[in-house]
Curated annotation (Swiss-Prot):
Lipidation residue positions, type S-diacylglycerol cysteine: 18
Record protein name field: Uncharacterized lipoprotein TP_0503
Keywords for the protein's UniProt record, in alphabetical order: Cell membrane, Lipoprotein, Membrane, Palmitate, Signal
Residues carrying lipid (N-palmitoyl cysteine): 18
GO cellular component: plasma membrane
Membrane association type: Lipid-anchor
Organism: Treponema pallidum (strain Nichols)
Signal sequence coordinates: 1-17
Length: 187
């Protein structure tokens, strides 16, 4: 998934501001109580709104606001995408999987150094990943069994992190972006 740890400020989720901490394969989400935010309108005046005043808005990116209905619609779309990915994973269908990859994902997981790092991290020693197909078979398929969408976090109006709760932890299972009206996996 996302290489290297980073903290990303994201949307309001159930009245709390969440921070996503990415790691090599999984991430976690921690939340703190919301603070009053400053929003700049087009006329240049700064208005201060509490989260209660913006109850219908879950994220803002410049002048673009993601509403609760946008959130629910996007979550439903991503539940369908993840259901398709679950079937593809169960069937080990490499060619159908390729349809869901962004160009950046294909490039990243075709790079020799990334494939070598992934080979070194595999529990089964002696497996050498040489191609994207090897990554799919030995890394993606075993790590993406029965994924579900418990929540989503908007990184931008088109980029979303898919979160699954497991064992009391929130796990980042997919970074995904809407590209030309289709959801594509990001590295």
């Amino acid at each position: 998934m996302y290489a290297g740890g980073r903290v990303v400020r994201s949307a309001f989720a159930r009245g709390k501001v969440c921070y996503l901490i990415g790691s090599v394969l999984w991430g976690s989400v921690s939340c703190t109580q919301p603070r009053v935010q400053k929003w700049v309108q087009n006329d240049g005046k700064v208005n201060v709104h509490s989260p209660q005043e913006r109850a219908g808005v879950v994220a803002t990116f410049g002048t673009v606001r993601i509403t609760r209905s946008d959130y629910e619609r996007t979550k439903a779309e991503l539940q369908d995408v993840v259901a398709h990915l679950n079937r593809i994973t169960a069937e080990r269908d490499y060619h159908k999987w390729l349809v869901y990859l962004s160009d950046a994902y294909r490039r990243a997981y075709s790079m020799p150094d990334i494939l070598q790092q992934s080979s070194d991290a595999l529990p089964k020693k002696g497996v050498r990943l040489r191609h994207l197909r090897d990554y799919f078979i030995h890394v993606f398929v075993p790590s993406r069994q029965n994924v579900r969408v418990d929540s989503i976090v908007f990184e931008s109006p088109t980029r979303v992190d898919v979160i699954m709760n497991h064992g009391g932890k929130a796990l980042l299972v997919y970074k995904i972006e809407k590209i030309h009206s289709a959801w594509k996996l990001l590295p």
